[in-house]
Amino acid sequence: MERKNQTAITEFIILGFSNLNELQFLLFTIFFLTYFCTLGGNILIILTTVTDPHLHTPMYYFLGNLAFIDICYTTSNVPQMMVHLLSKKKSISYVGCVVQLFAFVFFVGSECLLLAAMAYDRYIAICNPLRYSVILSKVLCNQLAASCWAAGFLNSVVHTVLTFCLPFCGNNQINYFFCDIPPLLILSCGNTSVNELALLSTGVFIGWTPFLCIVLSYICIISTILRIQSSEGRRKAFSTCASHLAIVFLFYGSAIFTYVRPISTYSLKKDRLVSVLYSVVTPMLNPIIYTLRNKDIKEAVKTIGSKWQPPISSLDSKLTY
């Protein structure tokens, strides 16, 4: 009978913002605009880096990968969050929950490692520019990107299997926006010590290690920037580094805070805000931060725009005709 009760759950109820009934439509509008900006900005980056031959460099190769990851992991949860804001039925099937958790953890883990690869790219470009094309060959770039994706995949497989091997004994209400590891561990009626150990271990490998590598890379970059003679050049370089580091601290800070701590310390009502930062806000800010001061991207966008725009002479001839 106990085994039957443990396997009886066929769906989960996502509570999300159910306590804010009067703000449901406002929140839907905010999430919709954020998701629209995320898709638009990241799709533009992918199209630009693929179609412009001048952007076929390691930096933009990694940036294109980052844009694709941001689209995927935002799509894994935000559309469902918007549906639940306007729907009375706020449920997700057991299988749907498995798929959502796997996808989200896969893409978040891959992004953690990819950001470190991007920092390494910037370190070589600024601190060792003469050997940049030799060190960061096409083969190495492909290997780095593939390693990020593979490690993210394996990390997701481990946590998905461990999470859904746990028993769920009747209560199926997830006090969160989507199916994520911490709320499911809290919901489980089994022993989660193995899951917590796995979170801590992978948190060190996928969270803290790449984060520290990024910080060390930017320390070297900043020390090189300080030797730039032009004050204007130093100012622009510092401004770019500061914006990149702001995104890194926001993403890693919220992700590490969410996953790398004991389950007993979780307060899902408070932690929901943190989850919004790295799952909704950061993917929208990435294309802005990484392309705002980038002249190459701006020029490429103008070039693409001019190709889609018909010549004025042809328009005049059509109008006169």
From Swiss-Prot:
Odorant receptor. GO terms for biological process: detection of chemical stimulus involved in sensory perception of smell. Gene3D superfamilies: Rhodopsin 7-helix transmembrane proteins. The chain crosses the membrane at residues 26-46, 55-75, 100-120, 140-160, 197-217, 238-258, 272-292. The gene is OR5V1. Pfam families: 7tm_4. Belongs to the G-protein coupled receptor 1 family. Residues 47-54, 121-139, 218-237, 293-321 are cytoplasmic. Its main location: membrane. Disulfide bonds join C97-C189. GO terms for cellular component: plasma membrane. It comes from the Eukaryota. Keywords: Cell membrane, Disulfide bond, G-protein coupled receptor, Glycoprotein, Membrane, Olfaction, Receptor, Sensory transduction, Transducer, Transmembrane, Transmembrane helix. It is a multi-pass membrane protein. It comes from Homo sapiens. Glycans are attached at N5. Residues 1-25, 76-99, 161-196, 259-271 are extracellular. It is found in: Cell membrane. InterPro entries: GPCR_Rhodpsn (IPR000276), GPCR_Rhodpsn_7TM (IPR017452), Olfact_rcpt (IPR000725), Olfactory_GPCR (IPR050516). This is Olfactory receptor 5V1. One of its GO terms (molecular function) is G protein-coupled receptor activity.
